[in-house]
Regions:
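Rossmann-like S-adenosyl-L-methionine
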Residues: 1-123
Length: 123
């Protein structure tokens, strides 16, 4: 098994590499770049996808490419409910269903929440 992480912030990629090394993980590859541009270079079909896009959600072209992988399950983490709703509308129209959803208060005493959705491919 292999973990591939794509992150636009270079410092976050370096931190992920350092964290993987500190934990003795040698099956991780972290790529710095925009997922829309990098996704075409990832030829292996993932078993599972975890999405944590910026506030505006996933670029529609990137979302289409992610859907084409046809994974059975994915996690979508969102910090903006309207972006999540827009992307979930596309995902559900393309054969995914929301299995579970919960809100996580990552920023106490603020008006912000993270929403975590577990999606699965409809049979």
């Amino acid at each position: 098994r292999k973990v591939i992480g794509v992150e636009i912030v270079e410092e976050a990629v370096e931190a992920a590499k350092e964290n993987a090394a500190l934990n003795g993980l040698d099956n991780c590859e972290f790529i710095a770049g925009d997922v829309l541009k990098v996704i075409d270079d990832i030829e292996e079909k993932p078993d599972y996808i975890i999405l944590d896009p910026p506030r505006d959600g996933i670029h529609p072209k990137a979302l289409e490419k992610i859907i084409r992988y046809g994974v059975d399950r994915m996690i979508y983490i969102s910090c903006k409910p309207t972006s999540l709703a827009r992307d979930l509308e596309v995902l559900t129209a393309r054969g995914y269903q929301v299995e579970r959803m919960c809100c996580v208060d990552m920023f106490p005493w603020s008006g912000n929440i993270e929403t975590v959705c577990m999606l699965s491919k409809k049979d």
